[in-house]
């Protein structure tokens, strides 16, 4: 079964305040093993970035002002995720931002009930009363966080893949395939690569 592990970074916490997506990553997997197909973009959010958000992911408008706008990448994004289940941690947050961007362009929104698996919901059902942030789940499952000095959508997709495997009781993927390095043009430009055996390069 094909899935897409998806993560975004944004200019702030809520679309209601006009905040927008500035980074999006989608990693295709087959039975949770990466296929080497990746969609990754840094995006000009067309607005300033809140100081709190910038502290989390490290991006500023100055860094992103010459990147593509969401309108420029929307079709490629929609084509990439078409007919795939999306695995997202705290899905309502990411989907609210994605659907806000799609609505701006009069494009069909993502149906969160039909097309999305929320790993946070699964974690809350398995570990009620615990903090189930991505960081805390990585610690719980002994997943290496040493490279996560800032939030990064591409790296976080790989961390989420490993967390999700543990949540659903699958075999550790590093035993099933050799390390493979994923790059996209934006990732290469920013010096970002993710070794899908769990190391970021």
Where are these regions (language model features)?
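Conserved non-catalytic scaffold segment of RNase H-like nuclease domains
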Residues: 1-114, 124-127, 134-151
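Short, flexible loop segments at boundaries between secondary-structure elements
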Residues: 120
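Acidic, divalent-metal-coordinating active-site segment for phosphoryl/phosphodiester hydrolysis
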Residues: 152-163
